[in-house]
UniProtKB/Swiss-Prot annotation:
It is an enzyme of class 2 (transferase). Belongs to the protein kinase superfamily. Ser/Thr protein kinase family. Its main location: virion. This is Serine/threonine-protein kinase 1. It is found in: Virion; Host cytoplasm. It comes from the Viruses. Its EC number is 2.7.11.1. The active site is at D152. Residues 38-276 form the Protein kinase domain. It catalyses: L-seryl-[protein] + ATP = O-phospho-L-seryl-[protein] + ADP + H(+); L-threonyl-[protein] + ATP = O-phospho-L-threonyl-[protein] + ADP + H(+).
C-alpha cells in the first residue's frame, strides 16, 4: 500500500471523517494525465449538481468535486483558472473529466468548516462577525477586479479555518463575467438569498445583488442556523436586525438589506464603512497551507 493511500485511510478513521463520510467509506484510485490520486468512495457532500469527496496525493490531502455535465457547463474550471492567484479564493490544483462529470481537484483546508456549520449552534460575537464580513468584502473585491462575480455568496460557500478565523470562498459554479451596466434576467444562485428586485421585477444588477447577499450573510452570523433569516422574512418586515451590536453594525446591515436597490449601499463603499474602522485592508493567508497536515493525519 502506497503512502498516500495509507494517509487517506488514516484520515477516514478520524472522528471528523467518521462524521462526514460514515464508516462505509473506502479508498479507490483515480488517475489523471499528471498524477495518481486516492479518493474516498463516500462523498463529504451531496448536492443537486455536484458531489464532493476527500482525496489524497503525495503529502497533501485534496478535494475532488464532481460536477454533472447534464446540469451545468464547465464554467467553474475557467473561472478558477482565471482566479488562481487571487487571495481568499479556493485553489484549483488540477482538472479532468469523464463522460458524465467535470472533475475538479481542489485544495483541502485543514481544520476548516463551512460558515453555515460554524455558527450552527452559536451566535457570533460582533468582533468576530465583523472581521469575517470584512474579509468577505475584500475577497469579493479581488474577484471583481479580475472581472468576475461569484453569483452565489452564502454561508455554505464560505469556509473558515476555525483556529485562525480566516475565510476562503468556494463553489464558483454560479460565477459569471462581471457586467455592471446591464440588467440580468437569469438567477444562478440560491433562492433564499435572492434580492428583492429580482423577486418583484424579474431582473437585477450584479453589484446590488452582491451587496444584498453580503448583508444576508452578516445578519445570519448573529443568529443560530435554525433561526436564519431569508428574503421572505425581510419582505414581511420581520425584526431581523441584531439587537446586541453597535449602531454602526446595525447601520451596515440595514443599508445592505435596503429593499430599494438604488438606496442600498454601493459595492465600492462597503470597504470604507465605519463599522470596519481600524481593520487592516489585507487578506491573511492560511499559514502552512498545503504543507502541515499534522492535525488531520494522525
Amino acid at each position: 500500500m502506497s503512502r498516500p493511500e495509507q494517509q487517506l485511510k488514516k484520515m477516514l478513521k478520524t472522528p471528523q471523517a467518521q462524521y462526514a463520510f460514515y464508516p462505509t467509506a473506502k479508498v479507490e484510485r483515480i488517475s489523471t494525465t499528471q498524477h495518481m490520486y486516492f479518493i474516498a468512495t463516500r462523498p463529504m457532500f451531496e448536492g443537486g449538481r455536484n458531489n464532493v469527496f476527500l482525496g489524497h496525493q503525495v503529502g497533501q490531502p485534496i478535494i475532488f468535486k464532481y460536477v454533472s455535465k447534464k446540469e451545468i457547463p464547465g464554467n467553474e474550471v475557467i473561472v478558477l483558472k482565471a482566479l488562481q492567484d487571487t487571495p481568499g479564493v479556493i485553489k484549483l490544483i488540477e482538472y479532468t473529466e469523464n463522460a458524465m462529470y467535470h472533475i475538479l481537484i481542489i485544495e483541502y483546508i485543514p481544520n476548516s468548516v463551512d460558515l453555515l456549520h460554524y455558527h450552527y449552534f452559536k451566535k457570533l460575537e460582533e468582533t468576530e462577525a465583523k472581521k469575517i464580513i470584512f474579509q468577505l468584502i475584500l475577497i469579493i473585491q479581488n474577484i471583481y477586479e479580475k472581472g468576475f462575480i461569484h453569483g452565489d455568496i452564502k454561508d455554505e460557500n464560505l469556509i473558515i479555518d476555525i483556529n485562525q478565523k480566516i475565510i476562503k470562498v468556494i463553489d464558483f459554479g454560479s460565477a459569471v463575467r462581471l457586467d455592471e451596466t446591464r440588467p440580468q434576467y437569469n438567477m444562478f444562485g440560491t433562492w433564499e438569498y435572492v434580492c428583492p428586485e429580482f423577486y418583484y421585477y424579474g431582473y437585477y444588477y450584479q453589484l446590488p445583488l452582491t451587496v444584498w447577499t453580503i448583508g444576508m450573510v452578516a445578519v445570519n452570523l448573529f443568529r443560530f442556523r435554525a433561526e436564519n433569516f431569508y428574503l421572505n422574512d425581510i419582505l414581511k418586515r420581520e425584526n431581523y436586525i441584531p439587537e446586541n451590536i453597535s449602531e454602526t453594525g446595525k447601520q451596515f446591515i440595514t443599508e445592505c438589506l435596503t429593499i430599494n436597490e438604488n438606496k442600498r449601499l454601493s459595492f465600492k463603499s462597503l470597504v470604507s464603512h465605519p463599522w470596519f474602522k481600524g481593520l487592516k485592508k489585507e487578506i491573511q493567508p492560511i499559514s502552512e497551507l498545503g504543507v502541515d497536515y499534522k492535525n488531520v493525519i494522525t
